[in-house]
Amino acid sequence: MSKPRKQQHRKPKGRPISGWLILDKPLDFGSTEAVSKIKWLFNAQKAGHAGTLDPLASGMLPIALGDATKTVPYVMDGRKIYEFTVTWGEQRATDDLEGEVVESSDQRPEEQAIRDILPNYTGVIMQTPPQFSAIKIAGERAYDLARDGETVEIPAREVEIHRLTLLACPDADTAHFEVECGKGTYVRALARDMGRDLGCFGHISELRRTMVAPFGEDMMVPLETLTALEAIEDRDERLEALDAFLIDTAEALSSLPRLIINDDQAHRLKMGNPILLRGRDAPANHPEAYATAQGKLVAIGEIGEGEFRPKRVFG
């Protein structure tokens, strides 16, 4: 009788590289497609993004490589800034240029009328996501149901708009805005609702994301800058040039308290054990904090009862 074969664990393909790449995503390029491209360019074992950006939108798409994928939730929860253009006179099925026209009006809003409604969309508000959205209804994505011709009731939910600014009204048909908002806000829904309030309908005709906290606009790297490096024939030189654009994994955790620890403490944390925090300078209790040793991220954990208990370890 033959012995059962031992299950072989495949070695992951690619490099075990970690860090954040803050991509300036071009138009007509999906978020999943962008992640696949970056993963291939960097020859990374693992990659993921922190917040979908529609193909018809451009701008910031933070992409996590390797261990940085463990910090994605901290970026997903961050504030976001968008610049967008609303075209008045038409409401569309998708609330952007892609969808068919479902309502229209010859009315056009005066600039002062637009300014007058902005306070209604600032602070904590109730917002109904678009029919074409990733919201799940009875286990199915709303956009899948919408594509099948179903109109579904999507419940309104609480979102927070920190700032909504009218930048310009270049003509009667369009208005440019900037919004700083919290997690779960749909800018397309914002355009739809403002159009309804103004009695003229409206949809997004341009959308660009310029910030996903803690990452700023100056950190963005255009895709063409990265793809141009494919011309470097030497593989090691090419990867070194690409790696220069990576941001340290711990940057995503900048809103949390930081502990600087020694190598012995780092070893204990990596084994899943807590470390004692002694002395007057020991930090107060906190549900989440992160620890670094020699500038490298070691763990995310909880501070309580005079110790740091690891929840996630790195490297």
UniProtKB/Swiss-Prot annotation:
- Identify which residues the record assigns to the active site: D54
Could you state one GO biological process linked to this protein? tRNA pseudouridine synthesis
Among the Pfam families in the record, one is: TruB_N
The first-level EC class reads isomerase
> InterPro entries recorded for this chain?
PsdUridine_synth_cat_dom_sf, PsdUridine_synth_N, PUA-like_sf, tRNA_psdUridine_synth_TruB, TruB_C
Entries under Gene3D superfamilies matching the protein: Pseudouridine synthase (3.30.2350.10)
The reaction(s) catalysed by this protein are:
uridine(55) in tRNA = pseudouridine(55) in tRNA
Cited HAMAP family: TruB_bact (MF_01080)
The free-text function statement in the UniProt record for this protein reads: Responsible for synthesis of pseudouridine from uracil-55 in the psi GC loop of transfer RNAs.
Family indicated by similarity: Belongs to the pseudouridine synthase TruB family. Type 1 subfamily.
The name under which this protein is listed is tRNA pseudouridine synthase B
